[in-house]
UniProtKB/Swiss-Prot annotation:
HAMAP family registered for this protein in UniProt: Adenylate_kinase_Adk
Catalytic activity field: AMP + ATP = 2 ADP
Quaternary structure note: Monomer.
GO cellular component: cytoplasm
Keyword presence, Zinc: yes
Family statement: Belongs to the adenylate kinase family.
MF GO annotations: adenylate kinase activity; ATP binding; zinc ion binding
Residues engaged in binding ATP: G11, A12, G13, K14, G15, T16, R128, T137, Y138, Q201
Keyword flag Nucleotide-binding: yes
Organism: Lactobacillus johnsonii (strain CNCM I-12250 / La1 / NCC 533)
Residues the record lists as binding AMP: T32, R37, N58, L59, V60, G86, F87, P88, R89, Q93, R162, R173
Protein name: Adenylate kinase
Notes on the domains: Consists of three domains, a large central CORE domain and two small peripheral domains, NMPbind and LID, which undergo movements during catalysis. The LID domain closes over the site of phosphoryl transfer upon ATP binding. Assembling and dissambling the active center during each catalytic cycle provides an effective means to prevent ATP hydrolysis. Some bacteria have evolved a zinc-coordinating structure that stabilizes the LID domain.
């Protein structure tokens, strides 16, 4: 059984890697964002508790998020293993998760960090641009327009960049994430379950390296 967390800064390629892992190993992909939406839509007790914080514009306390994670990990689709997306983000959450996995007898088997140099991440994240006319989104590096300066969808020629995709804003976002990510890595390194892969390779090669780690166990 594989019970896995992927770590990495925004733009490291966690989403793409997650899809490949789920496809091959048939793991339950557990996203905290999806969990919150589902629990609130179904009006479960924990979902309503989370909603009471969100409606006031407050952060949901760690203990409430942990309750949601525990509910989700009890679902039958996690019996072959799971991959956690968006939790834990801090060492406090990591400790709460450890308590949950012990209770449910579903210990984490792997934590894999996808490493990408900060300059590369800034280039990746600030390469996004959007068509003014129809809102189609492109990326200069990974998904440019077929004809330079012309939108594939509507043929428009004017593009803009969102404020939070500008390099200086991206840099700040990465700094905030790095402050949370580093202690988490240290936490799992001490547990002896942390592995790292080079995220500057092609998505196929990144998955190949992850696959080698998961196949070893």
């Amino acid at each position: 059984m594989i019970n896995l967390i992927l770590l990495g800064l925004p733009g490291a390629g966690k989403g793409t890697a997650s899809e490949s892992i789920v496809d091959k190993y048939h793991l339950a992909h557990i996203s905290t964002g999806d969990m919150f939406r589902e629990a609130m839509a179904n009006e479960t007790p924990v979902g309503l508790e989370a909603k009471s914080y969100i409606d006031k514009g407050n952060l949901v306390p760690d203990e409430v998020t942990a309750k949601l994670v525990e509910e989700r990990l009890k679902q039958p689709d996690t019996k072959n293993g799971f991959i956690l997306d968006g939790f834990p983000r801090t060492t406090v959450q990591a400790e709460l998760l450890e308590d949950i996995t012990k209770r449910l007898e579903k210990p984490l088997t792997n934590v894999i960090a996808i490493d990408v140099d900060e300059d590369v991440l800034i280039k990746r994240l600030s390469a996004r641009y959007i068509c003014k006319k129809c809102g189609a989104t492109y990326n200069k590096i990974s998904n440019p327009t077929k004809v330079e300066g012309t939108c594939d969808r509507c043929g428009g020629h004017e593009f803009f960049q969102r404020e939070d995709d500008k390099p200086e804003v991206v840099k700040n976002r990465l700094e905030v994430n790095k402050k949370m990510n580093t202690p988490l890595r240290d936490f799992y390194e001490e547990k002896g379950i942390l592995s790292t892969v080079n995220g500057e390779q092609t998505p196929e090669k990144v998955f190949e390296d992850i696959d080698k780690i998961l196949s070893k166990d």
